[in-house]
Swiss-Prot record:
InterPro entries: DNA-dir_RNA_pol_30-40kDasu_CS, DNA-dir_RNA_pol_insert, DNA-dir_RNA_pol_RpoA/D/Rpb3, RBP11-like, RNAP_Rpo3/Rpb3/RPAC1, RNApol_insert_sf, Rpo3/RPB3_RNA_Pol_subunit
Keyword Nucleotidyltransferase annotated: yes
Chief location of this protein within or outside the cell: cytoplasm
Gene3D superfamilies for the chain: 3.30.70.20, DNA-directed RNA polymerase, insert domain, RNA polymerase, RBP11-like subunit
Annotated gene: rpo3
Protein name: DNA-directed RNA polymerase subunit Rpo3
Functional summary from the UniProt entry: DNA-dependent RNA polymerase (RNAP) catalyzes the transcription of DNA into RNA using the four ribonucleoside triphosphates as substrates.
Gene source species: Methanopyrus kandleri (strain AV19 / DSM 6324 / JCM 9639 / NBRC 100938)
Length: 275
């Protein structure tokens, strides 16, 4: 069995991190396992409870609470917190499994995520300039929130990523005899391949992972050029939601997979040995 190979194809960082990896010598099932682990098994911190003491704005309490619950919260070391179900307090609420914040504003003004005042120095909104609502003249909002660690398996708001996807690595299949016979001329809009009078004059192999012209190649070259998606190599795209770094999210997803496999291994050994 050949070892799995991974290389970073593209990385960009602005408000969030985006990366594309090429994963080879693997299967769609394994790559999909990583995708699902990123969505469901990586803990993040999110607002779970909202206690509204005063809200004079036209926005319903339920809508206000819903907006607060979807704000990504950034904490560099999520390991300092425990999932409520696993905490020593039994989920009743303590400094290990929850963080509190207060919000108190008077109008007229706009309310942003940065207006939440957390009682933990390491916790802050991933995007402080996120607009929550507007408070008009003689209006007031006073509330308290409780944020807890959770998994995307429980609710989508706890996902550390906004998008994860994969596809088979594109590979060109070229019938050179057919190209010459029909004297085909074609240039890919993405600049990946150029054919002049039946001759392939340019192929940008490095940009093949970006290829999106599967049907056009076949149509414009009368089937002489086709794109095949490999089933043992994949283009893996991931984008964070700002709540943690990309490398942290990926490593924690892999740790979660490893933990489940170790648990499965121990239980199978126990069953087989009859202990």
């Amino acid at each position: 069995m050949s070892p799995l190979r991974v290389r970073l194809y593209d990385y960009r960082k602005a408000d969030v991190e985006r990366a594309t990896f090429i994963i080879e010598e693997t299967s769609a099932e394994f790559v999909n396992t990583i995708r699902r682990a990123l969505y469901t098994l990586v803990p993040t911190l999110r607002i779970e409870e909202v206690i509204i003491y005063e809200n004079d704005t036209p926005m319903y309490d339920e809508m206000l609470a819903h907006r607060l619950g979807l704000i990504p919260l950034r904490v560099d070391d999520i390991d300092q917190f425990e999932l409520p179900d696993l905490c020593d307090c039994g989920g009743k609420g303590c400094e290990k499994c929850q963080v509190r914040a207060e919000l108190e504003v008077e109008g007229p003004t706009k309310v942003y995520a940065r207006d939440l005042k957390f009682d933990h120095p390491d916790v802050e909104p991933a995007f402080p300039d996120t607009l929550i609502t507007e408070v008009g003249e003689d209006q007031r909002i006073r509330l308290e929130v409780i944020a807890v660690p959770g998994l995307g398996l429980e609710h989508a708001k706890w996902k550390p990523v906004s998008a994860v996807g994969y596809k088979g690595l594109p590979e060109l299949e070229i019938d050179e005899d057919k190209l010459k016979e029909k004297k085909i001329t074609y240039e890919c809009p993405q600049g990946i391949i150029r054919i002049e009078n039946g001759e392939v004059v340019h192929i940008d192999e490095d940009r093949l992972p970006e290829c999106r012209m599967y049907k056009e190649y076949e149509r414009e070259t009368d089937g002489a050029v086709r794109v095949r998606l490999r089933d043992d190599a994949f283009v893996f795209n991931v984008e964070t939601d700002g709540s943690m770094s990309l490398d942290t999210a990926i490593l924690k997803a892999l740790d979660a997979i490893e933990h489940k496999l170790e648990s499965l291994k121990k239980n199978l050994q126990k069953e087989v040995s009859g202990e």
